[in-house]
Every structure is written in C-alpha cells, then in structure tokens.
C-alpha cells in the first residue's frame, strides 16, 4: 500500500489541472440551480415529497394500528415481513415496466394504491384485514421501486447533475421525515383513524400531481 501511495503521488494525469479548473468555472450556486429547474424541483418535487411521505407513513401507521386493535408483536411481524417480501419481489418488474412503457406507469399506480390502502386501515379490525392492507401497501411500494430516483436522474441537467440530485434527495428525505411527526401529532391529539384518512387526503393531492403535472421522462431514442 505504501508503494501504491508513492506511485499515486508521482504519477498524475496531464489533464488533471485542466479538468479541475474547468469544473470550477462551470459550477453553479444552489440558488441558480433551483431557479433554472423550478418546475422540476417545485412542481415535480412536490409530487416526490408527497409520495415519500406516504411511503414512510406505512411504517408508522401499521404498527400503531396493529397494537390499537390488540394484535401481538408476532402477528405484526408476520404482516410486516409478508408486506416487505412482496415489495422486494416487484423490484425487477417495476424496473422493466419503467424502461419499457414509461416512468408514470409505475409511479401513478403506486401512489393510487398507497392512498387506497391508507383509506382502508380504519376498517381493518382484525388480523386478516390488516394483513390485506399490508399486502396492498407492499404491492404499491414495490411497483414504484426506483421510480423517483429514475425520475430525478431523467430531469437532472447535464451541467449540474450532482447538485440537482442532491436537492432532489433533500426533498425526498423531507417528505419521509415529515411522516412521523405528522402521523404522531394527529394520532395523539385527534385519532389514529383520522391520521390515516389525512394521509389518504394528501395522497389524493399527490395523485393529481403525478397524473397531470409530472411529465413522462422516458425517451426511446434507440433503434428497434
């Protein structure tokens, strides 16, 4: 390792200084990137925020509701495990559909099913019914696997790809981060049923964004 370090010190690319200088000249401020991509980060980013809020909320509401109807920890574990297993089995099919038909073919069904599942939680008064809700949540999250990362990569401008995706991820994490305090606050001061219906309402807003405002970014430029 010492020899490799010495070699790396004495051997350098003749274009290294030029590339570093070029990157400094073409760098943009975050505010400039936001301004130039205000539709992608503002409008499409709102859809991203909502979808990740719904995705994270399922990890919070399902356990709380399970204990609310008197289920034991092992029953909750089975529900969560089956839901996650279904989620993972859909990774590859979701990617295939995105590349074959378009990004919205996975993101739109995903947010519709997520919203539907949250509307059904209040009626899940038994293990079997909550298991069914968990299955729907697993399917809905699975078919949307990678959709938002792919959408962000499609929308990212070539001259500021990294910073754009950094902002994109920040929006995504913000949606995920809001789920716990939102569900917890509504559940504590009002009711857990109202919390699930509130998430459903937010989901319906997200459906409008994904159906009408989020563009299809798949570009089929290859020859058949």
Residue ranges of predicted features:
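Helix-loop boundary and gating motifs at the non-cytosolic
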Residues: 40-47, 51-69, 75-77
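A membrane-interface helix-boundary motif in multi-pass transporters
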Residues: 1, 185-203
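Helix-to-loop junctions at the C-terminal end of transmembrane segments
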Residues: 90-102, 187-188
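Juxtamembrane intracellular "pre-TM" segments in multi-pass secondary transporters
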Residues: 12-45
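Intracellular juxtamembrane helix-capping segments at the cytosolic ends
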Residues: 143-156
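C-terminal membrane-cytosol helix-exit motif in multi-pass small-molecule transporters
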Residues: 1-20, 206-214
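A late C-terminal transmembrane helix in Major Facilitator Superfamily
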Residues: 161-189
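Structural signature of the two symmetry-related core transmembrane helices
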Residues: 105-120
